[in-house]
Every structure is written in structure tokens, then in C-alpha cells.
Design a protein with these regions (language model features):
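Short, well-ordered alpha-helical
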Residues: 1-42, 46-47, 52, 67-72
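Acyltransferase
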Residues: 199-216, 241-247, 268-289
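Short glycine/serine-rich loop segments
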Residues: 46, 54-169
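Conserved small/polar residues in nucleotide/adenosyl-binding loops
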Residues: 297
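Gly/Ser-rich, acidic/histidine-flanked active-site/gating loops
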Residues: 170-230, 262
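Short helix-loop capping/hinge segments that flank enzyme active sites or metal/cofactor-binding pockets
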Residues: 14-32, 230-274
């Protein structure tokens, strides 16, 4: 099924966990779904999230496959094989945390961990029909997570229920606690373009739930996407550019990395300004609403 990159048995807790193979586990190589890293040294210490899991009644049973170098949203891995989408075998699993999402859809673990820079937890969760969460940036430790330097990447869980997502978050972030709220949450829908089938499905659900939500606009939405991609491209080239010389990277990721090499520091600085404007808009909306609904797959 190409879901599992490597099996293991670490810890003896009651919760079974699989983690994306871009997270260090002591004594194992972190290959990030790429043949170009097959000869890398084994990790000398556990990533901080692994330490947290082992301190909270968990057993780590496997590393999961991913879109090569976590640089893609389809989950297709031309180097090591693409994880099958258990619920929809004819469709892509989504990426980059494809194996982590597919493992949950196949009921191979209680929860799994992935990483999300520009949708890499949210996309595969949507594609595989499971729950996935990208926490607030900086909330969950990235120590021991690859690439080492990222200004957008987050570690986040996948599970088959919201309750298990909450449990996973309590394990990987000691400060996390489920919010208690007596009143109904104030929600709004972000106005983004989407396929009519997606729009109709959401409206159908809201109607059945007897919910009428306001629609809100974000002026910097499209420019924020472009800015995010510039930052991601620049940082991935810094992290993995040297690997393009090995001849061992799949054609799709090789092409994306070589294109990313053209991203300049001037572009990144401008992108950071857009990021700040976008963050300001979102923060203002979250002063009024508890959550904003946005389609993951449009």
C-alpha cells in the first residue's frame, strides 16, 4: 500500500502512533520520502514531539511515507511509491503527509503525526476522509523536524475523531487543553472560489444542521497564497538545493526545486510584508468569530 516507510516498536503505551518520515526518531534514518537521503546518518536523538509522545502512554509503530521531501500536495511519490488512498483508491491521497493520512483511513494507528507548511496536513486529511489539524505556528515544537528551518511549517495530528485529535494535541503540546464553551461558537465562511459540487455539499450540510453562517472576505487572500509559495520555495531550496545534484530526486520535485532556486531574497522580504498584512486581517476576523470555515479541496 506504500503507506508505511519503516516499521518499528518504540515505547509500550496503549496509544499506537505512526509519524511522518520527516520527523527524527533516534536510531533511524530520516529519509523524507527520498532516495537522495537513503544514505543519511541515523538520528542521534528523538525529535521533541517523539519525546512528548513517549512520555504520554504512546507506542510508535512506524514511520509513514510522504510526497518526496514534503514538497508537494498530491502525495504522489515517484521515488518510493505513492500511498494508496484507502477510502478512495482511484484518487490521490493528498500531500505531503500522504502516508500519515492514509494510515488513519486504513485504521493502522490511533493517531498519526504529519507536518503542514502550506496544506500538508489539511489536504491529505480532506482527500482521505479523516480529521487533520494544523496547529498555530510555533505551538508544537519543530526540534528534530525536517527541514530544520521553516517559518511556516507545523507538526499536526491525524485521527478518525475530533476527540482523538484533542488527545494527540494534549500529548504533543503540554499547554493544550480542549476549550469549554457553553454558547454556540460564532462561525463564518471565507469567501473563496470552489467547485460547485463542493459549495453545494457544504451548503447542504449547513442546511441540515440549521446553521446560517455569514460570508466574509479577505482582501489579501490571493496575494497571501503567492507570498506563501515564495517563502516555501526559498526555504526548500535552501534546505534541499544540494540534493538536486545527486540525480536521485523524482522528476516532479527536482523540477520544483530547480524552479524554486530562482526565488530571490527581495521577493521573500516582500512576501513577509504580505504575510503580516494577511495575519492582521485574520486576527481581526478572529476577534469577532471563533473560527473561519474554508474549503480544503476546491
Amino acid at each position: 500500500m506504500n503507506i508505511i516507510a519503516e516499521k518499528m516498536q518504540i515505547g509500550s503505551g496503549k496509544f499506537t502512533v505512526m509519524v511522518k518520515d520527516s520527523i527524527d526518531i533516534q536510531g533511524y534514518k530520516t529519509k523524507s520520502g527520498s532516495r537522495s537521503l537513503e544514505n543519511s546518518a541515523v538520528a542521534q536523538v528523538h525529535a521533541q514531539v517523539i519525546k512528548n509522545l513517549l512520555a504520554h502512554d504512546c507506542t510508535i509503530t512506524a514511520k509513514t511515507n510522504l510526497h518526496e521531501l514534503a514538497f508537494g500536495i498530491t502525495g504522489i511519490n515517484h521515488a518510493l511509491g505513492t500511498p494508496i488512498n484507502p477510502k478512495y483508491p482511484e484518487l490521490i491521497p493528498g500531500g505531503s503527509s500522504s502516508g500519515s493520512a492514509a494510515a488513519i483511513a486504513a485504521h493502522l494507528a490511533d493517531f498519526t503525526l504529519g507536518t503542514d507548511t502550506g496544506g500538508s496536513v489539511r489536504m491529505p486529511a480532506a482527500c482521505c476522509g479523516v480529521y487533520g489539524l494544523k496547529p498555530t505556528f510555533g505551538r508544537v515544537s519543530r526540534k528534530g523536524v525536517h527541514p530544520e528551518h521553516s517559518s511556516l511549517d507545523c507538526v499536526g495530528p491525524f485521527a478518525n475523531s475530533v476527540e482523538m485529535i484533542e488527545t494527540a494535541m494534549q500529548f504533543i503540546d503540554p499547554s493544550f487543553h480542549a476549550m469549554t464553551q457553553d454558547d454556540l461558537p460564532q462561525l463564518a465562511i471565507l469567501n473563496v472560489q470552489a467547485d460547485v459540487v463542493v459549495q453545494d455539499t457544504i451548503q447542504d450540510f449547513l442546511k441540515k444542521a440549521q446553521m446560517q453562517l455569514p460570508t466574509v472576505d479577505i482582501k489579501t487572500f490571493n496575494s497571501a497564497y503567492d507570498a506563501g509559495m515564495q517563502i516555501i520555495n526559498y526555504e526548500n531550496w535552501q534546505a534541499y538545493g544540494e540534493l538536486t545534484k545527486t540525480g536521485l530526486i523524482g522528476a516532479d520535485v527536482q523540477g520544483r526545486l530547480l524552479k524554486a532556486a530562482d526565488t530571490t531574497l527581495v521577493q521573500v522580504k516582500q512576501a513577509e510584508k504580505v504575510k503580516a498584512q494577511f495575519t492582521q486581517e485574520i486576527d481581526a476576523l478572529l476577534e469577532k468569530y471563533d473560527a473561519l470555515d474554508r474549503k480544503s479541496v476546491v
